[in-house]
Curated annotation (Swiss-Prot):
PROSITE patterns: CHCH. One of its GO terms (cellular component) is mitochondrial inner membrane. It comes from Saccharomyces cerevisiae (strain ATCC 204508 / S288c). The gene is MRP10. Its main location: mitochondrion. Residues 27-69 form the CHCH domain. One of its GO terms (biological process) is mitochondrial translation. This is Small ribosomal subunit protein mS37. Component of the mitochondrial ribosome (mitoribosome), a dedicated translation machinery responsible for the synthesis of mitochondrial genome-encoded proteins, including at least some of the essential transmembrane subunits of the mitochondrial respiratory chain. The mitoribosomes are attached to the mitochondrial inner membrane and translation products are cotranslationally integrated into the membrane.
Amino acid sequence: MSGKPPVYRLPPLPRLKVKKPIIRQEANKCLVLMSNLLQCWSSYGHMSPKCAGLVTELKSCTSESALGKRNNVQKSNINYHAARLYDRINGKPHD
């Protein structure tokens, strides 16, 4: 018997894959603008000149999103890196 502790390895898998990677999503810009506009209207009254800037920003934001100019959904790259580094994680035997 040798004094070495046993080496624990991952079970043999065809590939290492994360099923549902978590991706951070940014807040919808149009939703934030609409909230600010409604708050402005509740403070200063409907169609107040102080809120005119928010109205134009909200209109431009909604027209851009209607035309499809919004950002594409960002895909997670965790599975790419897991596949790339699987041999290092698994620890192939050196014998």
